[in-house]
């Protein structure tokens, strides 16, 4: 295979973003066509966030990004502040980017991957 779709929850979204910006995939002639990030804390560490901003020009314009953020406890999913999860938008500003804000009890950080609304939208986005 030369093309794949990727899903990352929490720090997994950060790892995938770092991978996409690293240049490694291009060297291996691999592309990511769709990226799903779920409750990822992009502003967890300022140095890391600054690095994402520095290297975002390496992100392929062909990747479509779907970002799920949770509002469980007001301005967070109980773990990740809403503003930190939404900071992905400034990193993926040249990509097709969609953000979905999930609310309520099933929008808690650890419950996000099994949230029925998320699973349905993720399945449609990935053509599963």
Language model: regions and residue ranges:
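C-terminal catalytic-base region of ester-bond hydrolases, centering on the histidine
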Residues: 58-128
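Serine-dependent carboxylesterase/thioesterase catalytic core
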Residues: 1-79
């Amino acid at each position: 295979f030369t093309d794949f779709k990727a899903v990352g929850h929490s720090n997994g979204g950060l790892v995938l973003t770092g991978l996409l910006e690293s240049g490694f995939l291009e060297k291996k002639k691999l592309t990511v066509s769709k990226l799903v990030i779920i409750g990822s804390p992009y502003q967890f560490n300022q140095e890391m966030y600054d690095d994402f901003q520095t290297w975002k020009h390496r992100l392929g314009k062909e990747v479509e990004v779907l970002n799920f953020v949770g509002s469980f406890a007001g301005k967070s999913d109980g773990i990740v502040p809403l503003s930190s999860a939404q900071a992905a938008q400034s990193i993926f500003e040249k990509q097709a980017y969609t953000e979905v804000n999930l609310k309520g009890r099933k929008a808690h950080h650890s419950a996000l991957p099994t949230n029925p609304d998320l699973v349905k939208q993720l399945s449609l986005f990935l053509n599963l």
